[in-house]
């Protein structure tokens, strides 16, 4: 089909012998002529070199699969803001297992029961025993409060988050995940529970496993497609096999070289390996088609096989080198990007293209030498040249029509690219049948979408934030955050349940005080009668104490008489002397009877009137004023003795003495009388001593003090009654005031509910205990255990441990939103949350704090930001590299400009087709990595066809651009078509992958290559070249070498002067190839490839 597609066209030469001028070096100089001679002389050496190289690398260098497991690709750079904040939060809270998390979903469609819970506990125990692979486990066995959160509303599923060691995607994390998966499968087997593993760690594991499974299937599909296309093109099995042998050998070598780069630190992703295989097959086959087609051209012109190989390598080698350099340099330039997938795939593809290029210009020519000498790869008749010649004629005749039609199609398709919506959710790239996808489906069925995707507001400060003021400022900050659209709840130290801590609001606290005041007011009102009784009792006591004073005064007078009589009796009868004299003093008998009568009367009165002494003594005992007054205290002591004398019978004994005196008779013997009196008198004297009456004067003074104390008590009781009455009046007034105050405070509690009105305050004592900053919470006073009627310190302590770092310098809040955490809306929300939080910082305790958001939406947002940055970098870098190479190759300015423009439009059109197919028809958003990766490949590969087309056009334009376009389209149409089909087939082979991102990328690349092959290179670019004319080759005079002159313009004028036909058909068919081929690089100093 393409055997003679590269056959040069002989056209009539101008009469001027331009070829005699030293414009160009002959075909004998340069790298490729010498390389061709070497290969023709030593083909077996070249083949042996490649076989030895592959044989050396294959057993000594680990496979690319093994290296991809050791050196996985981190999507974001290590200094990405979200990763920095995550590491800081992990360090501040001394946590592990946050970077790599797997989630076990345990479900029972019949409802969770006791048997399920036993299985759950056994699984938890097994996981806790695996301390190597499990660094964090959130279960409700050890933390009962988590039960409600970890149980679905329909009571059919539990979730069990498991933290794994290492970063997400690391070798350590992958190995730990595999062992944890085995534990889960073993423990749940045979139970009523169904276990599914999901979460970020499971997603990464499934991405790697799916990529590995897809690779062999993709390679097989690509091989079959290439065999079919090559068989159609060459219709020769040997010719068809040669490119495959070359590509197979180059793949082995390239994979081991990339593995060496991986050992040196280059990250390897499974998706990159897949694209690497497709790119190597496509590029290698393209280079083989270019070389074999030119080889067939020279064979048709009569050259033998060895000469044809040398000439083909000399002429087309330069184009292949320029094409490979464009692609490789562009790919290597991707090392300057930030995203891991782009940063690593660039060097991988660059190395691969370089290996394929060297195999195409060394191994393939050597194989062609050996097979060509035996005539195994002879060309077949061209079947498409007439079609492409006719196409060229139509374009030359109506260039504007063809340009407008093709441009309209491209612009419409490119416009669809602007409607693309990009997906950053890697879950959607996986097939629904993998383990993590099944787990996510179970989660979506039983739980909210954002349950296992935590998002934190992280605040770091140089000062301790465990103060009432800082917490109040934090509450104001998160209150603003909670008002951001889409934020459903913000939980943290100041709002454990997602709402501002009610007990810490000053309005609530004022309301509590008001409640207490209202309670006091009601109690006062309810006990008004009791208070009145108190006042009446005080008045009654004062009245009774007045009566007691009167009785005491009367009793004191009688006691005074008794004391005088006893004193007289003591003086009269005291001692043995007096008693001795009684026997001779009968005259005293009458006096003794009279004295007995007096004593009996007084003693009886005292005994009958001392009931007042006990209450008086009790009042004096409880009086601090009497205790402080020495005189009152002494009188209280004497009164105590009087009460004691009454109680212990002393007064009774005095009465007995009186009765004996009264009983004295004259008929009695004096001795008997005296003997009885002596005994009685001795008893009385002892009793008087116990009463302190040994000194009558002292007793009388003490009795006077008692009298005075009773008078003071009576006076004081009257004053007490007046004071109690005053107190009662004041309490009643205070009760009315408490009612008014409580009404005001309760109204404030009910109405001041907004943060600005309510305020926020946690007492320092409670905060100190709760955060463990001072005394342990268990030792705090009971009045703080349940401060202000509800703020329990034990609950607050658990909350503080989760949201306040041990040093108090970092605080985080858990943010729950109504949005899908993988959606672009969730990513856009991050800026709003951050702005709201930072807007609350000025003039607060948080003014110098660092505020950031941590979580998956932030990771995806940073991924999008880096992707946008990298896409701009890739576009600028790729355009500059390709443009510079085209300028150097063509030694012109205008043609490279519209060529690069056509490549960009072609890329946008291909992306637009992808949007139409996947987004509009299939309802899938485009994966975020598609624009950057496809741009590099489409522009770089499109540059290959540009170089082949425009270089041949410049060669053929010596007799005019219009005729040059016809001959160029006729001669290169088949080659470009074949190359485009082969490269597109290589890309379409990736459609057999299971990963959605690979399928989308493959479709866009394959479609873009076909679009570039059949529309841009065969219609749009030739039409532009015809319209631009000789200006295609314009170059500023300052850039022109000394020997440069516009060949096309001078020869074109000569041709137009002669008015020759555009296509001298006979000469065209017989024209030999031009040894001094204009295609390739040529510098004025004589150096060339």
Curated annotation (Swiss-Prot):
It is a multi-pass membrane protein. The keyword Membrane applies. Keywords: Cell membrane, Membrane, Transmembrane, Transmembrane helix. The chain crosses the membrane at residues 44-64, 222-242, 257-277, 316-336, 349-369, 400-420, 555-575, 874-894, 898-918, 930-950, 973-993, 996-1016. Residues 1066-1078 have a biased composition (Acidic residues). Residues 1-26, 1056-1078 are annotated as: Disordered. It is found in: Cell membrane. Pfam families: MMPL. The keyword rRNA processing does not apply. Belongs to the resistance-nodulation-cell division (RND) (TC 2.A.6) family. MmpL subfamily. NCBIfam families: actII (TIGR00833). PANTHER family: MEMBRANE PROTEIN MJ1562-RELATED, MEMBRANE PROTEIN YDGH-RELATED. In strain BCG, the sulfolipid-1 (SL-1) is not synthesized. This is Probable transport protein MmpL8.
């Amino acid at each position: 089909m393409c055997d003679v597609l590269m056959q040069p066209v002989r056209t009539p030469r101008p009469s001027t012998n331009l070829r005699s001028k030293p414009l160009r070096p002959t075909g004998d100089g340069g790298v490729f002529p010498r390389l061709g001679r070497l290969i023709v002389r030593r083909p077996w050496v070249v083949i042996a070199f490649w076989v030895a190289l592959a044989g050396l690398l294959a057993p000594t260098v680990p496979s690319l699969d093994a290296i991809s497991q050791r050196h996985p690709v981190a999507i974001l750079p290590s200094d990405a803001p979200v990763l920095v904040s995550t590491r800081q939060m992990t360090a501040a809270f001394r946590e592990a297992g946050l970077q790599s998390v797997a989630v076990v979903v345990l479900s029972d469609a019949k409802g969770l029961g006791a048997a399920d819970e036993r299985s759950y506990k056994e699984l938890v125990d097994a996981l806790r025993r695996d301390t190597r692979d499990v660094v964090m486990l959130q279960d409700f066995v050890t933390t009962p409060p988590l039960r409600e959160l970890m149980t679905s509303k329909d009571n059919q599923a539990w979730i069990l988050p498991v933290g794994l060691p290492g970063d997400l995607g690391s070798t350590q994390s992958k190995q730990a995940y595999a062992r944890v998966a085995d534990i889960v499968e073993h423990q749940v087997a045979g139970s009523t529970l169904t276990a599914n593993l999901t979460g970020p760690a499971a997603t990464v594991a499934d991405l790697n496993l799916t990529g590995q499974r897809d690779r062999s299937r993709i390679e097989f599909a690509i091989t079959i497609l290439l065999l079919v296309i090559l068989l159609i093109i060459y219709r020769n099995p040997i010719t068809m096999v040669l490119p495959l042998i070359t590509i197979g050998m180059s793949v082995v070598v390239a994979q081991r070289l990339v593995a060496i780069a991986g050992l040196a630190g280059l990250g390897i992703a499974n998706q990159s390996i897949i694209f690497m295989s497709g790119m190597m097959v496509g590029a290698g086959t393209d280079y083989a088609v270019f070389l074999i087609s030119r080889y067939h051209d020279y064979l048709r012109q009569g050259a033998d096989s060895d000469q044809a190989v040398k000439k083909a390598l000399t002429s087309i080698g330069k184009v292949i080198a320029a094409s490979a350099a464009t692609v490789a340099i562009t790919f290597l330039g991707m090392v300057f990007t930030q995203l891991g997938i782009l940063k690593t795939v660039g060097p991988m593809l660059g190395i691969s293209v370089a290996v394929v290029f060297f195999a195409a210009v060394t191994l393939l020519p050597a194989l062609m030498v050996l097979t060509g000498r035996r005539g195994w790869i002879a060309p077949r008749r061209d079947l498409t040249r007439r079609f492409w010649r006719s196409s060229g004629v139509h374009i030359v005749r109506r260039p504007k029509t063809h340009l407008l039609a093709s441009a309209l199609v491209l612009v419409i398709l490119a416009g669809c690219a602007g409607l693309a919506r990009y997906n950053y959710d890697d879950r959607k790239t996986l097939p629904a049948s993998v383990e993590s996808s099944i787990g996510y489906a179970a989660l979506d069925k039983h739980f909210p979408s954002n349950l296992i995707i935590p998002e934190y507001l992280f605040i770091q400060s140089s000062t301790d934030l465990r103060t009432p003021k800082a917490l109040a400022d934090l509450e104001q900050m998160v209150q603003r955050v909670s008002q951001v659209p889409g934020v459903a709840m913000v939980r943290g130290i100041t709002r454990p349940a997602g709402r501002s801590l009610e007990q810490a609001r000053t309005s609530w606290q004022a309301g509590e005080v008001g409640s207490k005041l209202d309670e006091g007011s009601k109690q006062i009102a309810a006990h008004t009668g009791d208070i009145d009784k108190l006042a009446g009792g005080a008045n009654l006591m004062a009245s009774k104490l007045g009566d007691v004073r009167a009785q005491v005064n009367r009793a004191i007078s009688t006691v005074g008489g008794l004391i005088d009589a006893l004193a007289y009796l003591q003086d009269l009868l005291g001692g043995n002397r007096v008693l001795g004299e009684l026997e001779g003093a009968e005259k005293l008998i009458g006096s003794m009877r009279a004295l007995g009568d007096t004593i009996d009367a007084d003693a009886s009165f005292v005994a009958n009137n001392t009931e007042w002494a006990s209450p008086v003594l009790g009042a004096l005992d409880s009086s601090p004023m009497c205790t402080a007054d020495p005189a009152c205290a002494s009188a209280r002591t004497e009164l105590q003795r009087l009460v004691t004398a009454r109680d212990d019978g002393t007064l009774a004994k005095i009465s007995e003495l009186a009765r004996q005196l009264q009983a004295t008779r004259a008929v009695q013997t004096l001795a008997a009388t005296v003997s009885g009196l002596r005994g009685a008198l001795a008893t009385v004297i002892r009793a008087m001593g116990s009463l302190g009456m040994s000194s009558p004067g002292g007793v009388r003074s003490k009795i006077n003090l008692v009298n005075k104390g009773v008078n003071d008590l009576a006076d004081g009781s009257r004053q007490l009654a007046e004071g109690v009455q005053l107190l009662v009046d004041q309490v009643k007034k205070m009760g009315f005031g408490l009612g008014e105050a409580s009404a005001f405070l309760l109204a404030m509690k009910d109405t001041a509910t907004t943060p600005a009105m309510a305020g926020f305050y946690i007492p320092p004592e409670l905060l100190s205990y709760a955060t463990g900053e001072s005394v342990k919470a268990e030792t705090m006073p009971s009045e703080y255990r349940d401060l202000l009627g509800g703020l329990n310190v034990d609950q607050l302590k658990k909350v503080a441990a989760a949201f306040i770092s041990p040093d108090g310098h970092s605080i985080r809040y858990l943010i729950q939103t109504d949005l899908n955490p993988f959606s672009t809306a969730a990513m856009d929300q991050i800026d709003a949350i951050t702005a709201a939080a930072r807007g609350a910082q000025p003039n607060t305790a948080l003014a110098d704090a660092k505020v950031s958001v941590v979580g998956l939406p932030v990771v995806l947002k940073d991924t999008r930001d880096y992707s946008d940055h990298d896409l701009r970098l890739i576009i600028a870098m790729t355009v500059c590299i390709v443009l510079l190479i085209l300028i150097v190759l063509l030694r012109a300015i205008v043609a490279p400009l519209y060529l690069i423009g056509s490549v960009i439009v072609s890329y946008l059109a291909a992306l637009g087709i992808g949007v139409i197919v996947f987004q509009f028809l299939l309802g899938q958003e485009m994966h975020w990595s598609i624009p950057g990766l496809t741009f590099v490949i489409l522009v770089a590969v499109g540059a290959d066809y540009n170089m082949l087309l425009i270089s041949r056009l410049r060669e053929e334009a010596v007799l005019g651009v219009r005729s040059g376009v016809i001959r160029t389209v006729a001669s290169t149409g088949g080659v470009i078509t074949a190359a485009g089909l082969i490269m597109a087939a290589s890309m379409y082979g990736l459609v057999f992958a299971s990963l959605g991102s690979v399928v989308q990328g493959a479709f866009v690349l394959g479609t873009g290559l076909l679009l570039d092959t059949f529309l841009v290179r065969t219609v749009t670019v030739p039409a532009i070249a015809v319209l631009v004319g000789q200006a295609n080759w314009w170059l500023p005079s300052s850039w022109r070498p000394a020997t440069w002159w516009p060949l096309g313009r001078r020869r074109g004028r000569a041709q137009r002067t002669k008015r020759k036909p555009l296509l001298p058909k006979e000469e065209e068919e017989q024209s030999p190839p031009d040894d001094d081929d204009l295609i390739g690089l040529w510098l004025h100093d004589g150096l060339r490839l």
